[in-house]
Amino acid sequence: MKRLLLIGIGAGDPGHLTLQGAKAIAAADVFLLVDKGEAKDDLTRLRRDLIAAHGREPYRIVEARDPERDRAAPAYTAAVEDWRSRRAQIYESFIADDLADGQTGALLVWGDPGLYDSTLAALDEIDAEFEYEVVPGISSVSALTARHRVALTRVGRPVHITTGRRLAAEGTTADDVVVMLDAACSFTGAGDDFHIYWGAYLGTPDEILIEGPVTEVAGRIRAARAEARARKGWIMDTYLLRRAPAGDRRGTQNG
């Protein structure tokens, strides 16, 4: 039986790789690296560095080009599903053509495979006989709260994890809202009683951290995001919106 490992590698710092993740890399015979283009070479470079550090020879690396997603399509969900299906075809070809029976393949997944990642959903579309295992990693959310030295949860309060697109459509539906990838800077629509903890390129040398009342730091975040995207050609950011308790606009209490 062919076997596939989905290995969470953390938010960007090589030190985010867990002991379990390092052992999983050492157990793999073949690695699939999905290239997102020249602008994101550093994403591929980190994966290669981790394989070189923890892989056991002889191993092979197979490369494939990530399919383009139509970001201008009016039907957002349909566009994402189409892109995911084409991603699934890449994985299916890798399993069929590059793995021999009894071999173990590996995908090194940014962050944690179980949070805001399409790999598991893509694997569900594959019609092939194989086993797979998920190795958890440090997510961008965990990295964000650690870097800002703030707890994700507060006593007796829910946390809502959403996207920038949904935040713009629905507004803040909880006192604590985590937003993944927000190209439109939808946090500007939060009320003046919200505090924001924002981070981009978490765990990398390019890491940017900004926090403060939304009304005071929104402009700084917009400017930093635009400059970083222009300089690098891409950006991955995450933030926590936290409503301050009555009489406290800092939003930093955890109890």
Placement of each model-derived feature along the sequence:
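Generic beta-sheet signal
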Residues: 3-7, 101-107, 132, 175-179, ...
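Short, well-ordered alpha-helix to beta-strand connector turns
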Residues: 25-29, 130, 174-175, 193
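A contiguous loop/helix-start segment that scaffolds small-molecule binding in enzyme catalytic cores
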Residues: 170-255
